[in-house]
């Protein structure tokens, strides 16, 4: 329950930033709107200090701070709904065919395609044990704006697993070696990142519409009493 609550709070934060509703958003000297956010939920101790969703729990930061998005996400009733995907069809008990949106680009400028999703998920299961154990992938094939995933076992919960923050789709052509260069499909781009601070700038080409908050500064606060 706590995990689902954290996911909900992360999506709420992104929604506030998209709509320019952050409680501490204010213009800086350059006239940009800046949202400064202190949190106890980011840092080395949380295993989420970074933006590589294929490592530990960093996917929570990728999603929460608007850098990446998943193929599906949970609604308020905890039912998976399409996000970067438009729908899915189970071909059999082991296999699901997912159709992708055709109007999405990564912040790198590369287009979101079935091949891009395939490359991302293949890297995910190579490097992320929990994802590999959840998804139990036997194969992934891509064709245009579709990707077909076959599991080694019956996979009734496969779509639910793809809602997990580790499932943020990133541009593997940009790689994952440098957190600042990680390219997702979200409304924000990493400008700088340390274990205690993230500086994000808005993605001017975000597929979901105009991003109203120009810059976000996230600072880790080790003592909750100082919030």
Describe the predicted segments one by one.
Residues 89-93, 97, 132-173, 187, ...:
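Surface-exposed binding/hinge segments that line
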Residues 38-91, 183-184:
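N-terminal lobe/hinge region of extracytoplasmic solute-binding protein
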Residues 120, 226-227:
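Short, hydrophobic alpha-helical packing/hinge segments within bilobed ligand-binding/sensory domains
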Residues 161-211, 215, 225:
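Gly/Pro-rich hinge or "lid" segments in bacterial periplasmic/extracellular proteins
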Residues 86-128:
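Aromatic- and charge-enriched surface segment that lines or borders ligand/interaction sites
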Residues 1-35, 79, 123:
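Short, low-complexity disordered leader/linker segments with a strong preference
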Residues 31, 43-54, 79-81, 157-160, ...:
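Short, solvent-exposed loop/turn elements at domain surfaces
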Residues 31-44, 95-99, 120, 147-149, ...:
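Short, well-ordered beta-strand elements
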